């Protein structure tokens, strides 16, 4: 029990030392802010920080409330205020404050206020906060607590040296020791110690009054009004907190709130230099507020001077008075018309930048051209432009007077904070003027003339627009004529549909076979020539396999070998093939064909005299005998040159196409070909240089038809490397020619 009582007494003594030393560091005239660094080492050394039996002879009697704490009573918060004492100033002195941009703000005259609060310290024993109640440690180590308090005092001493009040005191010392010029504009210049920095100790449990002084909560600079910083403090204040020290009786806390601006200046208004230097500045900054007083003073002065003159000179005096009043009135009107650059404005989040200007200033000419954003989705003016007064983009703000625009383009007007109408989605080459058809030219001319009369449009552009409208009216060829009741587009559409229906039966097989041919040989697709058409390319997706080709391939009796070797221009041959297939569509109801398979070339390609008869897609019924004979010859040549037939050549398929199904495995990186719902025309071509070589080879093969098999193999090997078919697919647009 004795040991616990001794520990408790030591803790209570540390709490008393905390309040006393903290107050001494802030209030004592021997604090670090008033002495040089060498003296500070002697006054606030390690011995002073570690000795907790310091006497309090220099502190006021009010500190006795916090000097004998027994652990049972409630200790009120201890408040220490640091202020600038103005009691020595007279009515001729003017106190001003300079902000961070160098602008001077009037604070008060010498006798209006006695104090300006600079700092407010809060020292307390917190035993009711959730932080203290949630602390789980019950026992207190006295040595550890003493070390923590020493660390707190050292941190407090460093913080005091960094606060703005210390810099203000250093300026005071320089002004006292330097040349004394009352009229100069140097900070805190006066003839003697008229101002000083003092402190006072207050009871935090009682209300703090600000009568006769400028309290800490009052902003001197008006731009700080209605604005808060990150810690929910007024913008002209800042706050620092020291980490609290835990004891069993509560948390020992120290915090400070202080002014951010500290560059005060004191000037004597009776000085001639000061009056000459600052008369124009104060007149412009206060202008409209001080004008009635100046007029009253001038009238009184004139009334006092009038008895000194004779009665005969009174008319002349009245004329001079009138002239002087007129001059003053002109000066006032000129000052009111000028933009108040030096006027102190109270900016808040809800303040409009144009609300400080008279209505005559709001009628400004803004350029009507705005940056075009064709790919931006959403409204342009969805946010109010007044949130940021420094924002230079005032295009979102509507003009004040626009009667002509509101009459014709009502939805385009936007109130502040709302979005612009739908017309902002598309940009017009005439600004806000909409385009109309020239059927009613008189009405459109009137609308354009009304819209052009907007104050936002320059005079030159108005004349240009009127000349352009007159030019449109003078040329009737430019008028847009509405379609008559005959509906010729419908006739063209019906003709196209009829042609499409006629082409459908003849191209059903071809469209399916083309899609199959695209998936047969992936190795040769890279070497195909580019098509002249604009049709979409087939999609490529993961692997899908065909079980068999279309059942129409089993119709071998009616099948014809569709091998086209066109010469010359590929587009011309493709167009002719479409014409032939269109003309002969009525006679080709029973036509069918084989899909052209990309692969190794067989010897049947060298019979040029036989194949030239089939250079068109449409084959008439008169050539059935020729087809059979050609197929028989191809079959014979295939059996003769069996070693030269490629597994995926046309001859290999033609020899076995009578089967109902031909299993062909689909490569893994090709998707199932999509058969389009529309019909496509296609033709197979080879390059012109290949046609000449193949013609020569076909002649040599006809002369040496019974030659050696090895020669045939050599020809087939060369053609396998060079004789890739080039696929041209025409566009899906139907030809208008019959």
Swiss-Prot record:
Domain of life of the native organism: Eukaryota
Post-translational modification comment from the UniProt entry: Phosphorylated; hyperphosphorylated by the TORC1 kinase complex to repress the induction of autophagy. Starvation and TOR inactivation results in ATG13 partial dephosphorylation leading to ATG1-binding. Rephosphorylated by ATG1 during prolonged nitrogen starvation. Also phosphorylated by TPK1; TPK1 phosphorylation regulates the association of ATG13 with the PAS. Within this regulatory network, mitochondrial respiratory deficiency suppresses autophagic flux. Hyperphosphorylation in rich medium is impaired in the absence of VAC8.
GO CC entries: Atg1/ULK1 kinase complex; cytosol; phagophore assembly site
UniProtKB keywords: Autophagy, Cytoplasm, Phosphoprotein, Protein transport, Transport
Database matches in Gene3D superfamilies: 6.10.140.1900, HORMA domain
Entry keyword annotation includes Cytoplasm: yes
Cystine connections: none
Protein name: Autophagy-related protein 13
Matching Pfam families: ATG13
Compositionally biased residues, Polar residues: 345-359, 534-558, 570-579
Compartments it resides in: Cytoplasm; Preautophagosomal structure
Residues recorded with modification Phosphoserine: 344, 348, 355, 437-438, 461, 496, 535, 541, 554, 581, 646, 649
Biased segments, Low complexity type: 284-297, 306-338, 382-399, 417-429, 694-708
Function: Activates the ATG1 kinase in a nutritional condition dependent manner through the TOR pathway, leading to autophagy. Required for autophosphorylation of ATG1 at 'Thr-226' and its dimerization. May also be involved in the regulation of autophagy through SNF1. Involved in ATG9 and ATG23 cycling through the pre-autophagosomal structure. Also involved in cytoplasm to vacuole transport (Cvt) and more specifically in Cvt vesicle formation. Seems to play a role in the switching machinery regulating the conversion between the Cvt pathway and autophagy.
Segments for region (Disordered): 279-359, 377-462, 521-605, 690-719
Subunit relationships: Hypophosphorylated form interacts with ATG1 to form the ATG1-ATG13 kinase complex. The ATG1-ATG13 complex interacts with the ATG17-ATG29-ATG31 complex through direct interaction with ATG17. Interacts with VAC8.
S-adenosyl-L-methionine among keywords: no
Stretches for region Interaction with ATG1: 432-520
Family to which the UniProt record says this protein belongs: Belongs to the ATG13 family. Fungi subfamily.
């Amino acid at each position: 029990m004795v040991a616990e009582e001794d520990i408790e007494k030591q803790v209570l003594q540390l709490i008393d030392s905390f309040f006393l030393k903290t107050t001494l560091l802030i209030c004592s005239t021997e604090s670090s802010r008033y002495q040089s660094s060498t003296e500070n080492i002697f006054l606030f050394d390690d011995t002073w920080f570690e000795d907790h039996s310091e006497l309090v002879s220099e502190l006021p009697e009010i500190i006795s409330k916090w000097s004998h704490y027994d652990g049972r009573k409630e200790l009120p918060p201890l408040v220490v205020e640091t202020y600038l004492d103005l009691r020595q100033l007279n009515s001729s002195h003017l106190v001003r404050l300079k902000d961070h941009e160098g602008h001077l703000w009037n604070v008060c005259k010498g006798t209006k206020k006695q104090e300006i609060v600079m700092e407010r310290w809060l020292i307390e024993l917190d035993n009711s906060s959730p932080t203290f109640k949630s602390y789980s440690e019950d026992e207190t180590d006295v040595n550890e607590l003493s070390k923590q308090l020493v660390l707190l005092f050292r941190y407090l001493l460093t913080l005091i040296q960094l606060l703005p009040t210390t810099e203000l005191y250093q300026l005071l010392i320089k002004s006292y020791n330097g040349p004394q010029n009352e009229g100069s504009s140097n900070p805190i210049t006066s003839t003697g110690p008229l101002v000083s920095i003092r402190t006072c100790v207050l009871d935090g449990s009682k209300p703090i009054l600000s009568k006769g002084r400028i309290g800490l909560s009052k902003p001197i600079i008006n731009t700080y009004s209605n604005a808060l910083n990150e810690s929910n403090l007024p913008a002209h204040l800042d706050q620092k907190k020291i980490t609290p020290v835990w004891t069993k009786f509560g948390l020992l806390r120290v915090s400070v709130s202080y002014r951010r601006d500290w560059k005060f200046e004191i000037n004597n208004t009776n000085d001639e230099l000061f009056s000459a230097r600052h008369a124009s500045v104060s007149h412009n900054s206060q202008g409209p507020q001080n004008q009635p007083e100046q007029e009253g003073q001038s009238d009184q002065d004139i009334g006092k001077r009038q008895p000194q003159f004779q009665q005969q000179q009174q008319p002349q005096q009245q004329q001079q008075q009138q002239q002087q009043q007129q001059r003053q009135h002109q000066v006032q009107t000129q000052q009111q018309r000028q933009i108040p650059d030096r006027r102190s404005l109270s900016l808040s989040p809800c303040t409009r930048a144009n609300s400080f200007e008279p209505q005559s200033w709001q009628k400004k000419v803004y350029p009507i051209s705005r940056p075009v954003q064709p790919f931006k989705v959403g409204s342009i003016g969805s946010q109010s432009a007044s949130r940021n007064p420094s924002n230079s983009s005032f295009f979102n703000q509507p003009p004040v007077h626009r009667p002509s625009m509101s009459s014709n383009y009502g939805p385009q007007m936007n109130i502040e904070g709302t979005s612009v109408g739908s017309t902002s989605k598309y940009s017009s080459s005439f600004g806000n003027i909409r385009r109309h058809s020239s059927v009613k030219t008189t009405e459109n001319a009137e609308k354009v003339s009304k819209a052009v009369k907007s104050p936002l449009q320059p005079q030159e552009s108005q004349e240009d627009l009127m000349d352009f409208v007159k030019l449109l009216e003078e040329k009737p060829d430019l008028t847009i004529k509405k379609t008559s009741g005959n509906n010729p587009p419908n006739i063209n559409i019906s003709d196209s549909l009829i042609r499409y229906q006629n082409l459908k039966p003849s191209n059903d097989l071809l469209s399916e076979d083309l899609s199959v041919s695209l998936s047969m040989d992936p190795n040769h697709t890279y070497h195909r020539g580019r098509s002249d058409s604009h049709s979409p390319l087939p999609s490529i997706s993961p692997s899908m396999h065909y079980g068999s080709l279309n059942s129409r391939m089993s119709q071998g009796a009616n099948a014809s070998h569709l091998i086209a070797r066109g010469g010359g221009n590929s587009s011309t041959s493709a167009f002719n093939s479409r014409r032939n297939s269109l003309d002969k569509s009525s006679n080709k109801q029973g036509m069918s064909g084989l899909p052209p398979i990309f692969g190794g070339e067989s010897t049947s390609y060298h019979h040029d005299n036989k194949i030239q008869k089939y250079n068109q897609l449409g084959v008439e019924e008169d050539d059935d005998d020729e087809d059979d004979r050609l197929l028989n010859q191809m079959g014979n040549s295939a059996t003769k040159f069996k070693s030269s037939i490629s597994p995926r050549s046309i001859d290999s398929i033609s020899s076995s196409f009578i089967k109902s199904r031909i299993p062909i495995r689909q490569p893994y990186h090709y998707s199932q070909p999509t058969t389009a719902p529309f019909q496509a025309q296609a033709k197979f071509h080879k390059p012109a240089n290949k046609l000449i070589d193949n013609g020569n080879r076909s002649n040599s093969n006809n002369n040496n038809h019974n030659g050696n098999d090895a020669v045939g193999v050599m020809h087939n090997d060369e053609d396998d490397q060079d004789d890739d078919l080039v696929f041209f697919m025409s566009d899906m647009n139907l030809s208008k020619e019959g």
